[in-house]
Design a protein with these regions (language model features):
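N-terminal lobe/hinge region of extracytoplasmic solute-binding protein
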Residues: 44-94, 218-219
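Surface-exposed ligand-recognition segments of extracellular binding domains, strongest
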Residues: 80-108, 139-201
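C-terminal motif of bacterial Sec signal peptides marking the signal peptidase cleavage site
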Residues: 28-31
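Gly/Pro-rich hinge or "lid" segments in bacterial periplasmic/extracellular proteins
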Residues: 162-164, 172-173, 178-244
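Ligand-site clamp/hinge motif
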Residues: 204, 231-279
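Aromatic- and charge-enriched surface segment that lines or borders ligand/interaction sites
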Residues: 89-145, 303-305, 310
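Alpha-helical secondary-structure segments
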Residues: 123-128, 172-176, 246, 266, ...
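Short, well-ordered beta-strand elements
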Residues: 38-50, 98-102, 126-129, 175-176, ...
């Protein structure tokens, strides 16, 4: 029996071998304690990431990088549950139309090679990020995901001022979303790259190159950019951890005709993207059009028969 989990998101077809799932499962176990030895994870991708602007990233390699570079309001834990990330807690009104988040104090962005910065992460950064999502000039693919936000359609088509968008800051650490209609998936959508914070002053300082180079990218997540060259994107974890500490996204240039399964067997990478749809004994994660799905063998004898594990792997960030 196969069990699929689907969430609207990407707009192109990809296929990633399930070795990713096996590796993620191993990292979950490692997270329970034990060795602090540095662990590396290597992705073979079609192209080196080129755009790390989370509000516009859509290509697979860019999204993979953004999901690890940026932290948002919420994340999924090892049990697949939504838990606070950059916020301490949140409240939802009884009618489901108002979401209030209370951010952690003292958070700052991280620069290239782990350099400390003076850019504090505040509620205004999320306000600015969502204004960018609904700025017609941004052409963000995430606007459709957050269409329930009050006045979003009018702001997007240019008939309303961005200041009327239903996202506001009350002081530095309180963020409020007002929806025009109930969206029971709203919290889950806040894990998408488009919902990641963006410091307006830093964005303006990049003069149109935000997310296009190491110098024009700041991290708010678990990893920061260590190096970004024609050879690949190399990320390191901000704090020592028994989980993955080094994440490498490199282009497969040795033999583009190889399937993902062959790449993993021959090139010793941790994961690879494949659009051949070739039959394999490995499980796969599929991304198609505006829907992506994780497919698991959920038979009684499979480790993936445990629903909580499937849920965790559906939302895990390395």
């Amino acid at each position: 029996m196969m069990n699929g989990m689907r969430v609207s998101f990407l707009n192109r077809f990809l296929r990633m071998t399930a070795v990713v799932l096996a590796a993620a499962f191993a990292f979950l176990l490692a997270g329970c304690g034990g060795s602090s030895t540095s662990t590396s994870f290597t992705w073979f991708v079609d192209n080196i990431p080129a755009n790390l602007d989370p509000q516009v990233a859509t290509k697979a390699e860019d999204v993979i990088a953004c999901e690890n570079l940026y932290g948002g309001l919420v994340r999924r834990n090892a049990s697949g549950e939504l838990v606070p990330d950059l916020c301490e807690r949140w409240e939802i009104s009884s009618d489901g139309l108002t979401y209030t988040f209370y951010l952690k104090s003292g958070l700052t962005y991280t620069g290239t090679k782990g350099a400390a910065t003076d850019y504090a992460i505040t509620a205004e950064d999320f306000v600015y990020a969502f204004r960018r999502v609904f700025d017609p000039q941004t052409a963000s693919p995430y606007a459709v995901e957050f269409s329930a936000i009050q006045n979003s359609a009018a702001v997007l088509d240019g008939t309303a001022d961005p200041g009327t968008l239903g996202v506001s800051a009350i002081g530095e650490l309180t963020l409020v979303f007002r929806l025009s209609e109930r969206d029971d998936t709203f919290l889950s959508k806040l894990t998408l790259p488009g919902a990641m914070p963006c410091d307006e002053a830093f964005f303006e300082s990049t003069r149109g190159t935000y997310g296009l180079s190491s110098a024009s990218t700041l991290s708010s997540g678990s990893f920061y950019i260590y190096n970004w060259t024609a050879s690949g994107l190399f990320l390191r974890r901000s704090a020592a951890s028994p989980l993955v500490n080094n994440l490498r996204l490199v282009q497969n240039t040795s033999n583009t005709d190889k399937s993902a399964a062959q790449l993993i067997a021959d090139e010793k990478c941790s994961a690879a993207l494949d659009d051949t749809a070739e039959a394999t004994s490995l499980q796969s994660v599929e991304y198609s059009d505006t829907t992506w799905a994780l497919l698991f063998n959920a038979s009684e004898v499979s480790v993936f028969a445990v629903a909580s594990l499937r849920q965790a792997l559906a939302g895990i960030a390395l």
